C-alpha cells in the first residue's frame, strides 16, 4: 500500500475525454494539456494491410479528404465508442506519450476515461483494454454525464436534482444527477458529426454540389444556428464545392437559414431526448430542474442559440457551462481526486 502511494507521487494521473471528434487530456495539477482531433492517418500497403502511422491529431485531420491512395485518414471513434480498436490504441499511445514520459521515477499513469452513458459492456471493455494497451497502469471509467456535471460545477453530491445535456461529436447525453449518482440517463447517437452530415446532404440536394467534412464543419461553426429570432442578422458564407452536373469546382453562398433547415432533424432528436428526460425524471427532481435550469456542455453547446431553442421547446431555463468543450475532461480530473479519497469502486471499473 505504501509503495503504491509512493508510486502515485511520481506519476501524473490522466483524465481522458476520448471523443468522436476530439480527444482531450487533463493532467492532475496541470489542467488541460492536450486537445487534438480524434483522427489518425495511416499508410497502407497495396494489399490494403496497415503499414505505419503517418500522422495523428491535427496533422491527420488536415489530410481528411485530401489523401493519396496510399494513405487513409481514419476517425477511429464513432458515436462515442471505438470503431477501430487497433487505430484507437495507436492514437491513445501517441497522445499519452505527448503528455507523459514514463521512466523509473515516473511510472505509467493511472488513467480515467470518460464513456457514453449508453455504451454497452462490450464497448466499455474495449475502451478499457485500449487504454491499457496504450500504456495505462490502471484504468477507471466514468460516464460522460457525471464527468460533465462535475466539470460544470453542479452540486452532484447533494439531494438536489441537476440536469446536464452533453452534446459531443458522436452522442448527446442527457442525465439527471443527485447524491453522486445518475438517477436518469439517456444517450442518443446525435452530435456534431450528424450536424455535419446533414449539411453535406443538404448542399448536395439543394445546390447539386459535394463538400467534405472539414467544409461542413466550418459552415456549422461560422454561420450555424439552432434558432433564428426576429431581428437576428442572417449570416452568409461562400462555399467551394464540386458541382455534380458540371463535374467542376463551383462556389455558392449559404445563409444561416439554409443551415438551420439542414440541421433541423438532428436538432429535433436532441429536443425529443430532453423532453423525454423531463417527463421521466422524479417529481422532486423535476421541480429542482425547473427552478435551477438545465446545463449544456460539450462542443454542441457552442452552436448559436441552441440554449434558446431548448428553453423555448421545454419551458425550462438553459445555461451554457463555462468552457463547455472541456467540461468532461476537467470533471474526469476532479473525479480522480475522488478516487484517491474514496477508492476506485465509486466508478464503473468492474468490467
UniProtKB/Swiss-Prot annotation:
GO molecular function term, any single one: ATP binding
Location(s), subcellular: Cytoplasm
CDD domains, per the entry: ASKHA_NBD_MreB-like
One Gene Ontology biological process: cell morphogenesis
Keywords for this protein: ATP-binding, Cell shape, Cytoplasm, Nucleotide-binding
InterPro entries named in the record: ATPase_NBD, MreB, MreB_MamK-like
Cited Gene3D superfamilies: 3.30.420.40
UniProt keyword Nucleotide-binding present: yes
SUPFAM superfamilies referenced in this protein's UniProt entry, alphabetically: Actin-like ATPase domain
Keyword ATP-binding: yes
Family: Belongs to the FtsA/MreB family.
NCBIfam families recorded: mreB, PRK13927.1
Role description: Forms membrane-associated dynamic filaments that are essential for cell shape determination. Acts by regulating cell wall synthesis and cell elongation, and thus cell shape. A feedback loop between cell geometry and MreB localization may maintain elongated cell shape by targeting cell wall growth to regions of negative cell wall curvature.
Assembly information from the UniProt record: Forms polymers.
PANTHER family: CELL SHAPE-DETERMINING PROTEIN MREB
Protein name: Cell shape-determining protein MreB
Species in which this protein is naturally found: Pasteurella multocida (strain Pm70)
The gene coding this protein: mreB
Amino acid at each position: 500500500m505504501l509503495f503504491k502511494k509512493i508510486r502515485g507521487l511520481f506519476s501524473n494521473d490522466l483524465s481522458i475525454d476520448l471523443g468522436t471528434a476530439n480527444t482531450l487530456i487533463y493532467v492532475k495539477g496541470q489542467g488541460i494539456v492536450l486537445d487534438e482531433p480524434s483522427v489518425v492517418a495511416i499508410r497502407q500497403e497495396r494489399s490494403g494491410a496497415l503499414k505505419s502511422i503517418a500522422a495523428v491529431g491535427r496533422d491527420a485531420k488536415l489530410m481528411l479528404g485530401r489523401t493519396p491512395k496510399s494513405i487513409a485518414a481514419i476517425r477511429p471513434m464513432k458515436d462515442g465508442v471505438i470503431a477501430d480498436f487497433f487505430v484507437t490504441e495507436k492514437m491513445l499511445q501517441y497522445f499519452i506519450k505527448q503528455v507523459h514520459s514514463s521512466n523509473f521515477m515516473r511510472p505509467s499513469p493511472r488513467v480515467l476515461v470518460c464513456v457514453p452513458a449508453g455504451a454497452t459492456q462490450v464497448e466499455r471493455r474495449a475502451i478499457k483494454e485500449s487504454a491499457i494497451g496504450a500504456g495505462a497502469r490502471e484504468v477507471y471509467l466514468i460516464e460522460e454525464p457525471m464527468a460533465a456535471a462535475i466539470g460544470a460545477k453542479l452540486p452532484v453530491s447533494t439531494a438536489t436534482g441537476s440536469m446536464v445535456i452533453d452534446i459531443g461529436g458522436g452522442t448527446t447525453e442527457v442525465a439527471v444527477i443527485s447524491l453522486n449518482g445518475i438517477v436518469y440517463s439517456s444517450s442518443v447517437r446525435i452530435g456534431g458529426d450528424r450536424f455535419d452530415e446533414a449539411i453535406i446532404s443538404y448542399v448536395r440536394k439543394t445546390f447539386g454540389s459535394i463538400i467534405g467534412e472539414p467544409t461542413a464543419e466550418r459552415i456549422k461553426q461560422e454561420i450555424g444556428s439552432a434558432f433564428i429570432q426576429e431581428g437576428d442578422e442572417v449570416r452568409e458564407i461562400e462555399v467551394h464545392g464540386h458541382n455534380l452536373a458540371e463535374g467542376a469546382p463551383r462556389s455558392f453562398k449559404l445563409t444561416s437559414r439554409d443551415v438551420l433547415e439542414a440541421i433541423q432533424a438532428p436538432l429535433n432528436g436532441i429536443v425529443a431526448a430532453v423532453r423525454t428526460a423531463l417527463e421521466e425524471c422524479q417529481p422532486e427532481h423535476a421541480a429542482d430542474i425547473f427552478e435551477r435550469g438545465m446545463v449544456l456542455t460539450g462542443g454542441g453547446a457552442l452552436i448559436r442559440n441552441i440554449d434558446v431553442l431548448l428553453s423555448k421547446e421545454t419551458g425550462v431555463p438553459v445555461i451554457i457551462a463555462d468552457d463547455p468543450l472541456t467540461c468532461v475532461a476537467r470533471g474526469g480530473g476532479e473525479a480522480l481526486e475522488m478516487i484517491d479519497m474514496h477508492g476506485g469502486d465509486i466508478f464503473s471499473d468492474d468490467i
